[in-house]
Amino acid sequence: MTSVLFMVGVLLGAFGSTHCSIQIVFPSETKLVWKPVLKGTRYCPQSAELNLEPDLKTMAFDSKVPIGITPSNSDGYLCHAAKWVTTCDFRWYGPKYITHSVHSLRPTVSDCKAAVEAYNAGTLMYPGFPPESCGYASITDSEFYVMLVTPHPVGVDDYRGHWVDPLFPTSECNSNFCETVHNATMWIPKDLKTHDVCSQDFQTIRVSVMYPQTKPTKGADLTLKSKFHAHMKGDRVCKMKFCNKNGLRLGNGEWIEVGDEVMLDNSKLLSLFPDCLVGSVVKSTLLSEGVQTALWETDRLLDYSLCQNTWEKIDRKEPLSAVDLSYLAPRSPGKGMAYIVANGSLMSAPARYIRVWIDSPILKEIKGKKESASGIDTVLWEQWLPFNGMELGPNGLIKTKSGYKFPLYLLGMGIVDQDLQELSSVNPVDHPHVPIAQAFVSEGEEVFFGDTGVSKNPIELISGWFSDWKETAAALGFAAISVILIIGLMRLLPLLCRRRKQKKVIYKDVELNSFDPRQAFHR
């Protein structure tokens, strides 16, 4: 036990005194929004399997493979193209109908590049719908061609140099202009640098050829492997030139150089394989730091099984250590989940993982270089929760009195101390809203947006009166009767007034009638 502690102390001292960078993947944010992990949740990053053939003879030779170029990060943009149309239907009888519509268009490479440049410069404008242009007795369209740019990071397949995202039709893309499942949307990486395929570096590796005890007569009897090629069956291998060099194209599309001097039991190795089909392409063997990290993890840890074992512990309500939590973390840049323990409950949060270079698995300050090994040290994490007398960060990262420790990478280097073995009870949460969340919204629900932008049509307003003929007939009958009654009253009132007046009676006087005023005057 004393010797073990002594060796651990020596290794810790070595890490403290050296400054070689270790590449890891870590969340790009310093804080995350955590939510409880519900019971039954189980997600693990997958890893490749190694199938080794026993009882085979082995021959080894030195070969060169193209290293390729690993994408520096997973940042990129979604480029949307659309035609925004304002339509004015100006009827001959006066009203104007204004409608708006959006029509999808396939963006071009030049349009997307120009839109991204404008977006980064802060000059990309979203004008919206154009103002209407109305011509009498005609239908007129006003159009704007709109380019929208949305930041969208994707995953990186280090082994093949592909972009990986569910938006891609085949879930992967290896060009600088990637189609998506939406015809009007394309994805382009942030870094648009181009490289000559033959200008890349070729690195020497040791390739082993395994074959039966009897003399092989064809390539299908062989199996090739190296520390970067786990198990390559010969029946899927063919010979072809790459950058004017002889070699073999493996079943996974990668290429290794094989010279004419490489012999296998007095036969040239190349002669055992058929020629590749015309037009065959090759993939680079990416010996970048990202791949070395992935291989280093795969060699020392069975990622998938260890992750599943952690979930089994959670289901059995067994205590977990910081190392157990580290097995749940993603291994490559892109989208992923981060995990932490809060008050005895397992919490998770969606995160964007990026490449980070740290000086050692044990740091005095939680700082590292993002996106480049030659970058500037920045703070990696600021959100800590209590954990058995220590403080816990994402995916098992722990803060102790002796420094900040990354359990996964300490374990990969053979450094195990008491802090990594501290256990804590962790349980998933049965969220009370789960039954409610499973309800579906009624399909009969309608949303009314109104008739804004449409002038009233007098003809349609009048025709609307006749939508119900019974009510209309009753209304017209009532109106006619009302008019007749009014006219009748107007004619009847004068007659009534005349009857009420008294007639003047004229009386005749005999004496006065016989009186002649002229005779009286002459007298």
Swiss-Prot record:
Glycosylated by host. Palmitoylated by host. GO terms for biological process: symbiont entry into host cell; virion attachment to host cell. It is found in: Virion membrane; Host membrane. Keywords: Disulfide bond, Glycoprotein, Host membrane, Host-virus interaction, Lipoprotein, Membrane, Palmitate, Signal, Transmembrane, Transmembrane helix, Viral attachment to host cell, Viral envelope protein, Virion, Virus entry into host cell. Residues 497-523 are intravirion. Residues 1-20 form the signal peptide. Pfam families: PH_Rhabdo_glycop, Rhabdo_glycop_CD, Rhabdo_glycop_FD. InterPro entries: PH_Rhabdo_glycop (IPR055448), Rhabdo_glycop_CD (IPR055447), Rhabdo_glycop_FD (IPR001903). Its main location: virion. Disulfide bonds join C44-C307, C79-C112, C88-C134, C173-C178, C198-C243, C238-C276. A lipid is attached at C497 (S-palmitoyl cysteine). The chain crosses the membrane at residues 476-496. Residues 57-176 are annotated as: Fusion peptide. The record marks H80, H182, H431 as: pH sensor in the pre-fusion state. Residues 21-475 are virion surface. Attaches the virus to host receptors, inducing clathrin-dependent endocytosis of the virion. In the endosome, the acidic pH induces conformational changes in the glycoprotein trimer, which trigger fusion between virus and endosomal membrane. Belongs to the vesiculovirus glycoprotein family. Homotrimer. Interacts with host LDL at target cell surface. This is Glycoprotein. It comes from Isfahan virus. The gene is G.
